[in-house]
C-alpha cells in the first residue's frame, strides 16, 4: 500500500524529465470552495470548506495535458463562541495533498472545455484551537494530531476562458478516520473509516 501511495509523487517528479521536448510548463494557482458530502458532511455539520492549490501543467498535442498539484483544504468541524465574551474555540479538519491530474481538452488545444481525472496522496489532520482576550491581554493554544494518510481520486470538468483564467468543478474522494464528535476538544482518531467525499469549485489562474 505504501508503494502505491508513493506512485503519484514519483510520477510528478518524473514528468519534467519526460516532457522537456514538449515545451515549457505553465504554473498556476487555484482558490476553491469545498462542499462536503456523505460522512464528511456529517462530521462538519454541512459547513463549506476552503482551500488553495499550486499547479504545474504540461500540455501535449491532441488536447492532452498532465498537471501535478499541491493542495491544502480546510473544513471546520465545530466552533464555540459564548456571547458577551472574546473567548473562542474551534476544531478543524485539514487535508494536505500531492497528486497528478490528466486533462483532455475537447477542442484539441488548451482552451475551452476539458475533462480531468487524477489521483494522489492526502494527509488529514485534526486541530483544536482556543483564543481569548481579556483587557490588553491575549492568550491562545493550539493542538494538532495526525488523522491518517490515504490514497485519493478525483474527476471533473472545467473551462479555460483565457490563457490565464479558468474554472473547474471536481468530485474528490479522500478517506480519513472518524473522530469523537461528542468531545469538542478532542483530536484523537478512531479506526473507523470515513469516505472523505466533497465537491470542489475552483477558480484557476495560470501564468
Predicted regions and their residues:
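Conserved active-site loop/cleft motifs that coordinate metal ions or position small ligands
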Residues: 165-171
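Individual transmembrane alpha-helices with interfacial aromatic-anchor signatures
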Residues: 144-146, 150, 155, 188-196
